[in-house]
Regions:
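Charged phosphate-binding loop/patch that engages nucleotide di/tri-phosphates or the phosphate backbone
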Residues: 102-133
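Active-site metal-binding core of divalent-cation-utilizing nuclease and nuclease-like domains
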Residues: 17-25, 34
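Domain-level recognition of nuclease-like catalytic cores that cleave nucleotide substrates
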Residues: 81-114
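Catalytic cores of nucleic-acid endonucleases
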Residues: 43-90
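Residues that act as N-cap/strand-start positions at coil-to-secondary-structure junctions
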Residues: 11-13, 23-25, 76
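Short acidic/polar mixed-charge low-complexity motifs
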Residues: 36-38, 89
Length: 133
C-alpha cells in the first residue's frame, strides 16, 4: 500500500516514474526529476508510540534463508532515497554509504531538548526535498 501511495504521489507531482520489470532490483522505482534519475526504495513507517512524536522505518530488506532470515541494509550504492508516508505526508530520506537498520524521524522535539543527532521529519518532506534535486 505504501509503495502505491508513494508511486502515485510522484506521478501527481508531475514526475516520470519507472518500475523495474522484474523483482531483482534493490529499488522500487526510478524517479525522473529535473533531468536526473533517482533510485527510490519505499518503506512503510509506523509511529513509535501513541504521542505521534516520531515515526520509524527500516533501512533493510529481509529474506528467508535456510532456517532463518537475512537482513541486508540498503546503501547509496544501491538506492538514492528512501520514501515513506505518514498521515498522508510524504518523506524522502537520503541513503548513506554504510546503511542503517532503522531510521527515526521526529515530528516533535524530544523532551530533553536535544537537537544534535536528531532527524526532524520537516527536513525530509517530499515537496521540499524534491525542490533541491
Amino acid at each position: 500500500m505504501t509503495e502505491q501511495k508513494c508511486f502515485l504521489k510522484c506521478i501527481e507531482s508531475g514526475f516520470i516514474v519507472s518500475k523495474p520489470l522484474f523483482d531483482n532490483a534493490r529499488y522500487d522505482f526510478i524517479l525522473d526529476a529535473n533531468g536526473k534519475l533517482y533510485r527510490i526504495q519505499v518503506k512503510t513507517s509506523h509511529w513509535t508510540d501513541d504521542t505521534k512524536a516520531a515515526f520509524v522505518f527500516n533501512g533493510y530488506s529481509q529474506h528467508s534463508v535456510g532456517n532463518g532470515n537475512k537482513r541486508m541494509k540498503y546503501t547509496n550504492q544501491e538506492i538514492d532515497y528512501f520514501m515513506t508516508e505518514q498521515d498522508n505526508i510524504f518523506y524522502l530520506y537520503p541513503a548513506n554509504e554504510e546503511g542503517f537498520v532503522e531510521k527515526k524521524l521526529r515530528i516533535i522535539p524530544p523532551k530533553s531538548g536535544q537537537v544534535k543527532n536528531i532527524s526532524f521529519a520537516k527536513d525530509y518532506v517530499f515537496e521540499e526535498v524534491i525542490k533541491n534535486l
